[in-house]
Amino acid sequence: MALTSEQKKSILSEFGLHETDTGSPEAQIALLTNRINNLTEHLKFHKHDHHSRRGLLLLVGRRRGLLKYLADNNVDRYRDLIARLGLRR
């Protein structure tokens, strides 16, 4: 299910650098993580939805690139973010 504007605002206020931050890596990774979790739940019930599976793989790759960028530029922010999101790394 798509994010509502209220859900997006709450995610951005929690993970962004300021209230309306949408461009920082932390904000982008948090939004991608939410979309990935929603798609993962969808695919548990719709195992043969291969179009959505490909979309999921693209989202995971985009998130991986942003995480790599953050890890290369600021390790402390990277470690804090993966701890807050509960990601394995």
UniProtKB/Swiss-Prot annotation:
Signal peptide: none annotated. Gene3D superfamilies: 6.10.250.3130, S15/NS1, RNA-binding. One of its GO terms (molecular function) is structural constituent of ribosome. Keywords: Ribonucleoprotein, Ribosomal protein, RNA-binding, rRNA-binding. The keyword rRNA-binding applies. HAMAP family: Ribosomal_uS15_B (MF_01343_B). Part of the 30S ribosomal subunit. Forms a bridge to the 50S subunit in the 70S ribosome, contacting the 23S rRNA. Belongs to the universal ribosomal protein uS15 family. One of the primary rRNA binding proteins, it binds directly to 16S rRNA where it helps nucleate assembly of the platform of the 30S subunit by binding and bridging several RNA helices of the 16S rRNA. This is Small ribosomal subunit protein uS15.
